[in-house]
Amino acid sequence: MKSKRFEVLAARPVNQDGYVQEWPEVGLIAMNSPFDPKPSIKIENGVITEMDGKCRADFDMLDTFIADHAIRLGNAEKAMAMDSLEIARKIVDINVSREEILDITLSLTPAKLTEVVGKLNIVEIMMGMTKMRARMMPANQCHVTNVRDNPVQIAADAAEAGVRGFAEMETTVAVARYAPFNAMALFVGAQVGRPGVMTQCALEEATELQLGMRGFTTYAETISVYGTEPVFMDGDDTPYSKAFLASCYASRGLKMRFTSGTGSEVQMGYAEGKSMLYLEARCLAVTKGAGVQGTQNGSVSCIGVPAGVPGGIRAVAAENLIAML
């Protein structure tokens, strides 16, 4: 028999939540899918001929890009031969330096990285983040938007946000043709509030690049990458086109970061039976291979997908750690 107090608590909406049953065949699984590949690597004449159980002849465009651009070959065979649990313990060990860890992890394949972080519990993942994060001083980003896309209000709000200490500001646009007004209003307002604040206007990628080239924005981060070939193709993209876009931003001196996150592939219906974390490890490998300055990940807009399956939030934390490895 329960008291009325516990009956009332149990009836609250927040306590009606539950988890979706895992469905590995369609990728509705956060970690350790039975269909995830086993880590492996073979190098011949300075070229990766096998990666994660797949021969080069069978590589899709992500595999080819990752093999050619995202893995340090000099130490790869030695690093891949190490026991995953040993690497995981090194990540947590306060006596092992960040540089020593990177010497190993930058030579690992996506499947191996997934296996390594899979050995860690949530507290160990946080300990690893404490050591592995590259940024010495944390900074905050804010969004400055309003229902009517009123540039005067955007400028005023941006100025206040600058005074409050935000390092980056983003605006989004309801009507695409208003984008230049929003971008300029955000830029002017932010600099009035505190000179040096970085601003962006999130749009379709070609338009966003144009705004940057014209000097209306100072960074971009909504350059999405995905973990399977069909999702890339759904957006008329490839890892190579994204890398080219990154070089365009770099040529103008604009800061930019890729965007990815666990759950996007299963949400699009093209997870190929792989776990969300493994697919995100592939995204992060593409990000590193393209040489961009950073990544916006942690599931972001897809958080409801991993959060709805067992171990999902642990997988999101694990992908953040992989981004630092």
Residue spans for each PLM region:
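Anaerobic metallocofactor- and corrinoid-dependent redox/one-carbon enzyme cores
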Residues: 1-155, 163, 170-325
